[in-house]
């Protein structure tokens, strides 16, 4: 069988995340339905991660096996003609038979966007997290350095994960500002359940002046979820890139 790799952009607002589930609408379900319409085959598409309800993606990676003779690059147009407008295939290609979108990843980059102004957003309400009080961005940037490297991120994991270890390596974490938007980029070899959202919630405690930057090290060393910040909403989170 042939192995087709897809790079997918999607708006997660209307979906219950990536992974197919009986209770509702998911990205995986929609993509599999589109593949069936194109190939007349029942397939199971393998995704690079399980993004939660409301989370978006610029370059999600998935793959599926098929007996179809459609050229790999042509799946992009074929599937886009069958998909809803909030899910778009931005690239399709045939890859080695042993390629696996999830198990072969070496890392991912996420971005979380905060809108830091008094007025709540109207147009971007599904893509940012609104914080009314002015944040101390410089202190947040200073705090980021404590996340870098290999640590046990047990304090940054919500109940519900099934991983064997909570040790992860954050290879890059930095903050960029665009007007009243604060963008927090986090790259790691892997992520725990809600890890990015908890990192952002903890950085907000620093940004609001409730804690000093060194507080981040205390939370990591404690391994105590209760010491970390809130789990911010999914709306501001976007999967930027998957590495292989």
Swiss-Prot record:
Keywords: Isomerase, tRNA processing. Substrate binds at residue 110. Its EC number is 5.4.99.12. GO terms for biological process: tRNA pseudouridine synthesis. One of its GO terms (molecular function) is RNA binding. Pfam families: PseudoU_synth_1 (PF01416). The active site is at 52 (nucleophile). It comes from the Bacteria. Signal peptide: none annotated. SUPFAM superfamilies: Pseudouridine synthase. It catalyses: uridine(38/39/40) in tRNA = pseudouridine(38/39/40) in tRNA. Homodimer. Formation of pseudouridine at positions 38, 39 and 40 in the anticodon stem and loop of transfer RNAs. Belongs to the tRNA pseudouridine synthase TruA family. NCBIfam families: hisT_truA. HAMAP family: TruA. This is tRNA pseudouridine synthase A 2. It comes from Clostridium perfringens (strain 13 / Type A). The lineage of its organism: Bacteria, Bacillati, Bacillota, Clostridia, Eubacteriales. The gene is truA2.
């Amino acid at each position: 069988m042939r192995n087709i790799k897809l790079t997918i952009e999607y708006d997660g607002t209307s979906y219950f995340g990536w992974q197919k589930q009986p209770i509702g609408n998911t990205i995986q379900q929609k993509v599999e339905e589109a593949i069936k319409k194109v190939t007349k085959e029942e397939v199971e598409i393998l995704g690079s991660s399980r993004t939660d309800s409301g989370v978006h993606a610029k370059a999600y990676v998935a793959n599926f096996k098929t007996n179809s003779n459609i050229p790999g690059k042509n799946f992009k147009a074929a599937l886009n003609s069958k998909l809803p407008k909030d899910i778009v295939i931005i690239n399709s290609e045939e890859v080695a038979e042993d390629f696996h979108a999830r198990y072969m990843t070496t890392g991912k980059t996420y971005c979380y966007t905060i809108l830091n102004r008094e007025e709540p957003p109207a147009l971007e309400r599904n893509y940012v997290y609104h914080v009314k009080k002015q944040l101390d961005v410089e202190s947040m940037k200073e705090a980021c350095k404590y996340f870098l490297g290999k640590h046990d991120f047990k304090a940054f994991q919500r109940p519900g994960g099934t991983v064997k270890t909570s040790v992860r390596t954050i290879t890059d974490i930095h903050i960029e500002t665009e007007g009243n938007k604060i963008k927090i980029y986090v790259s790691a070899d892997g992520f725990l359940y809600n890890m990015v959202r908890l990192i952002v919630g903890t950085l907000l405690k620093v940004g609001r002046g409730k804690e000093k930057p060194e507080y981040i090290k205390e939370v990591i060393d404690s391994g105590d979820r209760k010491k970390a910040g809130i789990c911010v909403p999914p709306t501001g989170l976007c999967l930027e890139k998957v590495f292989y």
